[in-house]
Regions:
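Active-site helix-to-loop segments that bind/position phosphate- or nucleotide-bearing substrates
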Residues: 1-200
């Protein structure tokens, strides 16, 4: 509850931001609070206290990392299909050959696609913390069996219907629709053409 209250408080300041740096600062704070809150509803055997990557330090982070990578590829396909340049974004900067626009557009899809998928897997005991993961060096990763299970669950999720858009679409179709809406917004200089999804 505290994390949600803090996020709502910080959210009120977002429209007052006068620079991308300030806006990204708010995004970073909210992201940290969000993952703290997420950790409180994760089963104890999948203990998760904060986001870790390169390497992921625990099974929950291992699944988030793999899921976000796959979602990144979905967004990249949508961006290219919409005729957009993946390296020209609004918030994330172009550095080290990173597709900034893809990083911009992925944010609204992380929770409804990947976070919900991973939570579903652990809460329904569909993946085993001891049997489906392996440790290598300092990192934790899905092993062969775990990866196969996760990929199957991901494919079902991305092809499943959702009601985030005005019409029934699969998540993959909705991602492509949002990329096209973004392209239309840029081409017509009309912010009304892009409506971010709201998590339900």
């Amino acid at each position: 509850m505290m994390s949600i209250n803090n996020i709502c408080h910080i959210r009120k300041n977002i429209h007052k931001a006068i620079s991308i740096e300030e806006l990204m600062g708010y995004e970073g704070i909210i992201s940290r609070l969000y993952f703290e809150g997420l950790g409180k509803i994760v089963p104890l055997e999948f203990i998760f206290t904060k986001r870790s990557k390169q390497p992921p330090l625990d099974p929950f982070n291992a699944m988030l990392g793999l899921g976000y990578s796959m979602l990144f590829n979905e967004i990249m396909a949508g961006v290219i299909n919409a005729g957009l340049h993946p390296f020209v974004g609004c918030m994330h900067s172009i550095k080290g050959g990173h597709p900034a626009l893809v990083s911009d557009l992925i944010e609204e899809w992380r929770a409804p696609v990947i976070d919900s998928l991973v939570l579903n897997l652990v809460k329904r005991n569909m993946i085993d913390v001891d049997e489906d993961f392996q440790y290598s060096g300092e990192g934790c990763y899905l092993n062969g069996a775990g990866r196969k299970l996760f990929l199957s669950a991901y494919n079902k999720k991305i092809k499943s219907m959702n009601q985030y858009m005005d019409r029934g679409q699969t998540f993959r179709e909705s991602i492509f629709s949002q990329c096209k809406a973004y392209a239309s917004t840029i081409m017509n200089i009309d912010l009304e053409r892009y409506t971010p999804i709201e998590i339900r």
